[in-house]
Every structure is written in structure tokens, then in C-alpha cells.
């Protein structure tokens, strides 16, 4: 890792069908072995399932799910004087979206169901309704930060 300069953020282009950067981020998080066309197909299928179930715009459901599952604060390990402290840190917007999509992805893969599209659609609907495992994970992160708020002065 170079110390000379920070890496530039790459521009994320919106996907061709929904014209949304969030859908592109979700596709990139669902990639397996670099097979983007497969990831794209089951995400589009999941968005169609959401549209059938909810009867509303699937992009709004996706945005609401990401908004509900984005943590505001997280803990990071910081080693000070031989002991490691869990230091609460505020989450930047782009990191929050990344964390939310990562959690939605992992819990949708663990769900019971026939296809990955159905699992993902159900997880996104649950997250949009503020239920399910993704919301529990966010609340757990907030509880960890609350429990360790005594170490907030170790922030860097």
C-alpha cells in the first residue's frame, strides 16, 4: 500500500436498465468469480419480484432498504499500550452504503428459499420494512458503539 498518495475513487456508472448507481453497487457486491452477467440477471429478477410483491417501484424499495440498514456508527479496533480497544467511529456515507449492501448480500445468501433472486428480494423487502437480520445487525453495531463510548476519545 503506497504511502505517497491516496487512491482515486473510481467512477461508478449507473446500470443500463434502472439507471441507478445503487443497483450497480449491488451487482458488484453480488459478484461471484467475476461473472457479472449472472449477478446482473438475478438482481434484475429480484427487482421484478419486488415489483410484483409490493406493487411499487423496486428502486424505492431498494433505496429504503439501504437507508434502513446503513449503520451510523461502527467500532474499530485500536491498539493502545498493549491493549486493544473497540473505538466508536462515525461512518462516512459511502462506507455506510457499502456496509449495508454487504450485510444485505450476506444475509440474503443465508436465507431459505429456492433461488438467490427470491432470497434477495425477500431480504430487501424485510430491510425496507425495518425487520429481518440486516436491521438486527445494524442495531447490534449501534449497541457495540454505545457500550464502548467510553473509548471515543481514542478516535483517530
Swiss-Prot record:
Q: Does the keyword Plastid apply?
A: yes
Q: Which InterPro entries match?
A: Ribosomal_uS7, Ribosomal_uS7_bac/org-type, Ribosomal_uS7_CS, Ribosomal_uS7_dom, Ribosomal_uS7_dom_sf
Q: What is its main location?
A: plastid
Question: Which Gene Ontology terms describe the biological processes this protein takes part in?
Answer: translation
Which keywords fit this entry according to its UniProt record? Answer: Cyanelle, Plastid, Ribonucleoprotein, Ribosomal protein, RNA-binding, rRNA-binding
**What residue stretch is flagged as signal peptide?**
none
Known partners and oligomeric status: Part of the 30S ribosomal subunit.
Instruction: Report the protein name in the record.
Output: Small ribosomal subunit protein uS7c
Q: What is the lineage of its organism?
A: Eukaryota, Glaucocystophyceae, Cyanophoraceae, Cyanophora
Amino acid at each position: 500500500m503506497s504511502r505517497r498518495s491516496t487512491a482515486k475513487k473510481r467512477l461508478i456508472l449507473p446500470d443500463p436498465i434502472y439507471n441507478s448507481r445503487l443497483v450497480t453497487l449491488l451487482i458488484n457486491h453480488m459478484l461471484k468469480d467475476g461473472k457479472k452477467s449472472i449477478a446482473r440477471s438475478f438482481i434484475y429478477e429480484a427487482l421484478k419480484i419486488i415489483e410484483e410483491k409490493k406493487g411499487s417501484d423496486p428502486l424505492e424499495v431498494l433505496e429504503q432498504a439501504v437507508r434502513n440498514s446503513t449503520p451510523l456508527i461502527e467500532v474499530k479496533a485500536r491498539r493502545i499500550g498493549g491493549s486493544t480497544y473497540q473505538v466508536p467511529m462515525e461512518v462516512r456515507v459511502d462506507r455506510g452504503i457499502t456496509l449495508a449492501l454487504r450485510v444485505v448480500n450476506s444475509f440474503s445468501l443465508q436465507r431459505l428459499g429456492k433461488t438467490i433472486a427470491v432470497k434477495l428480494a425477500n431480504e430487501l423487502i424485510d430491510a425496507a420494512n425495518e425487520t429481518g437480520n440486516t436491521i438486527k445487525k445494524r442495531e447490534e453495531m449501534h449497541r457495540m458503539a454505545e457500550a464502548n463510548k467510553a473509548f471515543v476519545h481514542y478516535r483517530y
